[in-house]
A protein has these predicted regions:
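Cationic, histidine-enriched alpha-helical/coil surfaces that engage anionic ligands
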Residues: 1-307
Length: 307
């Protein structure tokens, strides 16, 4: 939670800023959804680019709203944030299946074709097919459309006042401070004990910071994009580490289900585990790169609207 209480003027500006974030999200989600449905009609059931845009748009507004609720708890949007999280899950699972397909195919190509590798590729294809079907079905689900309706209804409760960047900057700066503090806490935990789940939590907090910083770039000015780019460098490294973790875990599971594949899956899983461990040792440098960013004061500092 925020360590300051937002005063009445500040609450109005919070809501104006949030309305802008929601407006952008609705446009992005609607555009991506339209592209996915058009691709379906044209016979392309996967539409990976549009699905990716849809997944990112949903996750971005979820993270942005979660942080703004920390800035001003009177927004009372916990249920909406939870709904957006659930709505995004099938698309995240499809993304994991796509990463799995690409990683396993790459590793097996280097090893050469065997009956076991062919069977493993079939299992990977089955996993991807199930994830694809689940995301397709989710697009037509009542839950998906109800959550998007809830998002729009929330938007309609927000003020339509116009505010200048100068008026909005103190609130935007404080929002970035809130998410930056959560990033630093997550990094401290990950440095103390470099477990997969702590690195994953850090990656999520970094994404919170990226999405919010870019969402308010028109208020914060050009230095905010440099800050976001540094965060993205860290996010991508942590993302690759997490991908190796996911692939290694899946291979262990499938090896338990198919005894004939276990020698191969154990071997490939070990390779992925080593890559994950290597990634877990590499994040200190990009983290320092983020911490060395000097114009943070212009991105984060100001308390004018806080009591």
């Amino acid at each position: 939670m925020s360590e300051w209480t937002v005063n009445e003027d500040g609450r109005v500006i919070v809501r104006v800023l949030v309305r802008g974030l929601v407006h952008v999200a609705r446009e992005e989600i609607a555009g991506a959804e339209t592209s996915v449905r058009r691709a379906r009609l044209e016979g392309d059931s996967s539409a990976p680019g549009s699905i990716r845009q849809l997944r990112i748009a949903i996750r971005r507004i979820e993270y942005q709203l979660a942080t703004m609720a920390d800035v001003d708890s009177s927004l009372d949007i916990d249920d909406l944030v939870k709904g957006l999280h659930e709505v995004g899950k099938p698309f995240g699972q499809l993304r994991d299946a796509e990463i799995l397909s690409a990683r396993v195919a790459k590793v097996l190509r280097a090893r050469g074709v065997t009956p076991e590798s062919d069977r493993l590729l079939e299992a990977v294809a089955d996993e991807h097919y199930r994830a694809q079907r689940a995301s397709d079905g989710w697009l037509d689900s009542e839950e998906f459309h109800r959550t998007l309706e809830d998002l729009n209804e929330f938007r309609l409760t927000l003020p339509t006042d116009a505010v200048t960047p100068t008026m909005a900057r103190p609130i935007a700066q404080h929002a970035i401070r809130v998410t930056w503090r959560s990033v630093k806490r997550a990094a401290k935990l990950a440095k103390e004990e470099s477990r997969d789940e702590l690195l994953h939590a850090l990656r999520r907090k970094v994404k919170h910071a990226v999405y919010l910083t870019r969402g308010f770039s028109y208020v914060l000015g050009p230095s905010s994009e440099e800050f976001a780019l540094r965060l993205v460098t860290l996010q991508k490294l942590l993302g690759r580490q997490h991908d190796h973790v996911v692939v290694a875990a899946w291979l262990q599971g499938i090896g338990g289900d198919y005894a004939s594949l276990k020698p191969l899956t154990d071997d490939v899983s070990l390779e992925e585990r080593r890559r994950a461990d290597h990634g877990a040792e590499e994040w200190a440098e990009p983290w320092q790169f983020v911490r060395d960013f000097r114009p943070k004061e212009t991105v984060m500092t100001s308390y004018s609207f806080f009591d």
